[in-house]
Every structure is written in structure tokens, then in C-alpha cells.
Amino acid sequence: MLSSILSKNTCAACKFCCSFRRQSLWETPLFPPEIAEKLQKTNKYGVTGKFAPASDGARDAHESQNAYRLVLENNYRTDDPEEEVPCTFLDPERGCILKPEDKPFDCSIWPLRIMDKGGKLVIALTPTCPSIGATPDKALVDLVQGGLGEQIFEYAKTHPYIVKEYREGFPVIM
């Protein structure tokens, strides 16, 4: 969805969005039940994930019984708050191994987020993407306002679990 702004090679080399510190576990992507079920069993990727309902207390008020999150918190090896744990489906050489039909929507639109800001849905930029930076440039704004934003809003209507609570410092694009 963002290929005109971010190349697959750039993202595969960076991998920032695919690893999580303890304080960023709220950012772990959510999977629809049918995808989580497929990925927790032997599958075409040769990697299985451990999933839990998103409503198990690890997320905000917009969670849904119809979403699952990867369980990553048991993968930390130290007590260091800066330690990062990669997504189960991240290959160190190739990047994400999931095909588009299995990739969470959150991942497809990152570093964009749909957020609830005071009861209004907004499209915001995650300010920590090393390739985009903390301020949206004209190309990104044009992409969002030129149709991608509406696609994200439409997806959120049928998948409300992708909506996150707004956090200060996330520039609103739309």
C-alpha cells in the first residue's frame, strides 16, 4: 500500500517495525481469527506463531473478540527494557515472510496508524519509522489524502480492532 513511498528492500533492510520492546507491545499487529488459526499450525511458511485473543488485556478499548495478537512477551531473554524481540514471521535476511493475503493490515499500512483522537478517527504517522521520519512529507500526505486514507477508514469500519488510541507525538495526516 505504501510501495510508492517505501520500497520492500528498504523495509527489509531496516526491520524496525517488526521488532518490539516491552513498551511497544501495544504496536504488535492484530490478525483476523482465520489467519491466526492458519499461522499457529504447520503452514506453507514453515514457521508457526503463538497467538492470544487481543482482548486478553494487552490492548486498548478498541479491541475486538475477533482479533488475535502474536504472543511475544515470553521471548525476551533479559530484563533490559531496550531489548527487542522480532516478529515470529520476520526472516533476518528477507524481511517479512508472509504473503500479502496473510499479512496483518497494521503491517500493510505501517508507519501509518488509524487512531481514535478524542472520539474522532484519524490517520496518523508513527514518528519512529527511520525511513519516513517524524514528520510526514508531501508525498506521504498526498498518498493518504489521495485515496489511501479512505481505504484505511473503510477497512476500520469492518475491522474496528485496528483502531488504536491516539498517542501524543503522532502527527495527524487526515
Regions found by a protein language model. Name each.
Residues 1-174:
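Short loop/turn segments that flank or connect secondary-structure elements
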